[in-house]
Regions:
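N-terminal targeting sequences that direct proteins away from the cytosol to non-cytosolic compartments
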Residues: 1-162, 171-217
Length: 217
C-alpha cells in the first residue's frame, strides 16, 4: 500500500509537500489522522473495524475481536496525544502476535543549525539519558538524502528499560527533516519488526510535483 498525506506543520494545507510511505498492509495499519472526517476516523470505530478484518480468516475466542480492538485504539490514542501531526503506523502482523508496535513519521522545518548537528539532535545520538552509549549509524535514503539511525535504551518504569529506534534525514529541496521513531519496552518485538521498519525507512519519500494527480486517476 502506498499512502500519501500532506505533511508539515500545516497538514491541511493543500500546498504542503506530501509524504509517501509504501508499506505492506498485511503487517501494518495506519492510524487515521485526527483531521480526517470520514465516519471511520473515530478511533473506536476504526479499531473495531480493523480488528474484525484481522480476525476474518481466524477462529477467535469470545472477546478476542474486542480485546484486539482495544489494543489498537489504545495505541492510536497514545500516538494522537503525543504526536498529533505525525503519521502513525502500527506493526500488526497477526492479531495473536505481540504488540502492536507504533512507528511515528513526521516532517519538521529546518532550524538555524547545520544539518549534521540537527540530525544528531533529532535522533538523540548524544542524549545523556541513555543507559549506554547509543549506537549511531549513517542511514542515507535514496529519496530523502543523508540520514542517521540511532538505537538506544533509556530508563523506564520500575527499573525496566525502553528501547528506541530513531531515524532522521535532511531533505535539502524543502529544507526540512523527516523523523521516524519507535519506542517499546518489548525488545523481542522490536527486533522482530526491524526488517519491516527498515523497509518503511527506505520507502518513505516526498511526493513529486504532479504525482498526486497521477495517483488519483
Amino acid at each position: 500500500v502506498t499512502e500519501t498525506t500532506p505533511s508539515w506543520e500545516h497538514a491541511n494545507d493543500e500546498t504542503a509537500p506530501g509524504l509517501v510511505i509504501d508499506y505492506d498492509a498485511s503487517v501494518w495499519c495506519e492510524v487515521p489522522p485526527m483531521w480526517v472526517e470520514e465516519d471511520w476516523a473515530e478511533l473506536g470505530t476504526w479499531s473495531l473495524r480493523f480488528s474484525e478484518l484481522c480476525w476474518e480468516h481466524e477462529d477467535p475466542a469470545p472477546g478476542d475481536v474486542e480485546a484486539y480492538a482495544d489494543q489498537l485504539r489504545g495505541a492510536g490514542e497514545i500516538a494522537q496525544a503525543h504526536a498529533p501531526g505525525a503519521r502513525a503506523l502500527l506493526y500488526t502482523p497477526h492479531p495473536r502476535a505481540r504488540g502492536p508496535l507504533t512507528v511515528l513519521v513526521d516532517v519538521l522545518p529546518a532550524e538555524d543549525m547545520e544539518p549534521a548537528a540537527a540530525l544528531r539532535l533529532l535522533t538523540l545520538a548524544d542524549d545523556d539519558d541513555a543507559v549506554r552509549a547509543p549506537v549511531v549509524d549513517a542511514f542515507p535514503s535514496p529519496d530523502l538524502g543523508d540520514g542517521l539511525r540511532v538505537s538506544r535504551a533509556i530508563p523506564g518504569d520500575e527499573d525496566g528499560l525502553f528501547f528506541q529506534l530513531r531515524y532522521a534525514w535532511y531533505y535539502e529541496e524543502y529544507d526540512a527533516y523527516v523523523l521516524m521513531v519507535t519506542i517499546t519496552h518489548d525488545l523481542e518485538l522490536l527486533i522482530s519488526a526491524i526488517p519491516e521498519i527498515e523497509y518503511l525507512a527506505m520507502s518513505t519519500r516526498f511526493l513529486e510535483p504532479g504525482e498526486a494527480e497521477v495517483m488519483d486517476e
